A protein has these predicted regions:
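C-terminal all-alpha effector/ligand-binding and dimerization domain
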Residues: 172-229
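Amphipathic alpha-helical regulatory segments at dimerization interfaces
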Residues: 58, 157-161
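All-alpha effector-binding/dimerization core of bacterial HTH-type transcriptional repressors
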Residues: 79-157, 193-216
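DNA-binding alpha-helical recognition surfaces that contact promoter or target DNA
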Residues: 54, 169, 215
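Short linear motifs at protein or domain termini
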Residues: 1-108
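Short, charge-rich, low-complexity alpha-helical interaction segments
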Residues: 160, 165-174, 178
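Short loop-to-helix capping motifs
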Residues: 37-38, 162-165, 208-209
Length: 229
């Protein structure tokens, strides 16, 4: 193989992958729709099967394509799987060594909005889950490891109750980092304050008071962010 061969092959595969993505989006393809085989795509883009195979592998790893084998095999647009993105992003955040300050800046940017939306959109089942989490956190206030896990779960349940998939997906990768930063600094006194704050946020959500729910969440996060570490 000539010098630069692997690099040229990689660049060619990346170029084809970008073209494939652009083509799929332009065609408005939906999850489950058939897009061809390696052979048909290689012919369509006038590249080798190796180049197409590498491009397809990359797009499959990124969650865009589903590669199927057998008599009904071929390439299809993959079904939506936000958990795949969430897991990958969570790992990257942990590798970055996200600081406590950065974590709370992100939470303050997202969570007052999710609380306000939850006040307008939460279903009866979602409100019931929020009540259960507030009650569970109150019972666990003396078990700080369990308490922290339940308290973080409350915040993510509020995001679920916002019924906004983009905001939910933005917050979800922070969960592991939240546990890492909050668990070591939570005291019984802090736990009791958090329980009261969560109950107040829930009350505003139940009252369908979006402005107050957002304000209470913002105040709560500001107080916790300045707790001694």
């Amino acid at each position: 193989m000539t010098r630069g061969g692997p690099q040229r092959q990689a660049r060619a595969s990346e170029d084809v992958a970008a073209q494939l993505m652009k083509s799929f989006y332009a065609d408005g393809l939906k999850p489950g729709e058939w897009v061809g085989t390696e052979a048909t795509l290689a012919e369509r883009f006038n590249v080798s099967r190796v180049t197409i195979r590498d491009a397809v592998s990359g797009l499959a790893a990124r969650g865009l394509l589903d590669v199927r084998v057998g008599a009904r095999g071929g390439l299809r647009i993959a079904s939506s799987d936000p958990e795949r993105l969430i897991d990958a992003f969570s790992i990257q955040l942990r590798l970055m060594g996200l600081s406590r300050e950065e974590l709370f800046e992100a939470m303050l940017a997202i969570e007052p909005v999710t609380a306000a939306l939850a006040a307008d959109r939460a279903s009866a089942a979602q409100l019931s889950e929020l009540r259960d989490l507030v009650e569970e956190s109150s019972r666990a206030a003396d078990d700080l490891v369990t308490f922290t896990s339940v308290a973080v779960a409350f915040h993510h349940a509020v995001a679920e109750a916002s019924n906004n998939r983009a905001l939910r997906a933005a917050l979800a990768p922070l969960r592991a980092t939240q546990l890492e930063h909050l668990a070591p600094t939570t005291t019984p006194a802090i736990a009791q304050r958090v329980v009261r704050a969560h109950a107040d946020i829930l009350a505003a959500i139940e009252a369908h008071d979006a402005l107050e729910a957002g304000n209470r969440m913002r105040t709560h996060l500001s107080v916790v962010s300045h707790a001694p570490v």
